Amino acid sequence: MAPDGSIARPTVLTGPSGVGKGTLVARLRERHPEIWLSVSATTRAPRSGEIDGIHYFFHSKERFNKLVQSGGLLEWAEFAGNCYGTPREPVSERVANGIPVLLEIELEGARQVRKSLPEAIQIFLAPPSVEELEKRIRGRGTEAEEAIQRRLKRAQEELEAQTEFDAVIVNDDLETALAELEKQMNLTIS
């Protein structure tokens, strides 16, 4: 059950690269360790230190394709020759047991989840402005100009889709965004 005794609803969180999804989710999980963050399945090889079932569910292409064909994934996509997706079963099990579930996924994945899990709360995390988003991306200092421009172009496309979501949270201040996310997820501070 959710904190108020209602049935737990899964929550989908998406937003452009650099908006602060990872930071917000980490802070949310500090305050609410009961939240289960979905674990993606992938066909890519594990990197050093990655543990199957913790960081990803590592599958062969054949096993992944069987999951796709059987409806075993809530959403999936292919990036750089590898497939990634959200397994349905672990999400369904936790929701059935009243555990709050959070899916931090890309826009296209969120659209697929809307069809496969219509009861999910869909939240879009937006930057205060495109200029601030660019500042954050450049502030990382990890990408070439061409990659930054690609991210900004994609971010503009994603920002145009925010009206598709149940709620939009502007990540101008981490604590304010956190309080709004907690409210949307019907979480209480213990």
From Swiss-Prot:
<comment type="function">
    <text>Essential for recycling GMP and indirectly, cGMP.</text>
</comment>
<dbReference type="GO" id="GO:0005524">
    <property type="term" value="F:ATP binding"/>
</dbReference>
<dbReference type="InterPro" id="IPR027417">
    <property type="entry name" value="P-loop_NTPase"/>
</dbReference>
<dbReference type="GO" id="GO:0005829">
    <property type="term" value="C:cytosol"/>
</dbReference>
<keyword id="KW-0418">Kinase</keyword>
<dbReference type="InterPro" id="IPR008145">
    <property type="entry name" value="GK/Ca_channel_bsu"/>
</dbReference>
<comment type="similarity">
    <text>Belongs to the guanylate kinase family.</text>
</comment>
<feature type="domain" description="Guanylate kinase-like">
    <location>
        <begin position="8"/>
        <end position="186"/>
    </location>
</feature>
<keyword id="KW-0808">Transferase</keyword>
<keyword id="KW-0547">Nucleotide-binding</keyword>
<comment type="pathway">
    <text>Purine metabolism.</text>
</comment>
<dbReference type="GO" id="GO:0004385">
    <property type="term" value="F:guanylate kinase activity"/>
</dbReference>
<comment type="function">
    <text>(Microbial infection) Catalyzes the phosphorylation of dZMP to dZDP, when the bacterium is infected by a phage that produces the substrate for the synthesis of dZTP (2- amino-2'-deoxyadenosine 5'-triphosphate), which is then used by the phage as a DNA polymerase substrate.</text>
</comment>
<feature type="binding site">
    <location>
        <begin position="15"/>
        <end position="22"/>
    </location>
    <ligand>
        <name>ATP</name>
    </ligand>
</feature>
<protein>
    <recommendedName>
        <fullName>Guanylate kinase</fullName>
        <ecNumber>2.7.4.8</ecNumber>
    </recommendedName>
</protein>
<dbReference type="InterPro" id="IPR020590">
    <property type="entry name" value="Guanylate_kinase_CS"/>
</dbReference>
<dbReference type="InterPro" id="IPR008144">
    <property type="entry name" value="Guanylate_kin-like_dom"/>
</dbReference>
<dbReference type="Pfam" id="PF00625">
    <property type="entry name" value="Guanylate_kin"/>
</dbReference>
<keyword id="KW-0963">Cytoplasm</keyword>
<dbReference type="InterPro" id="IPR017665">
    <property type="entry name" value="Guanylate_kinase"/>
</dbReference>
<keyword id="KW-0067">ATP-binding</keyword>
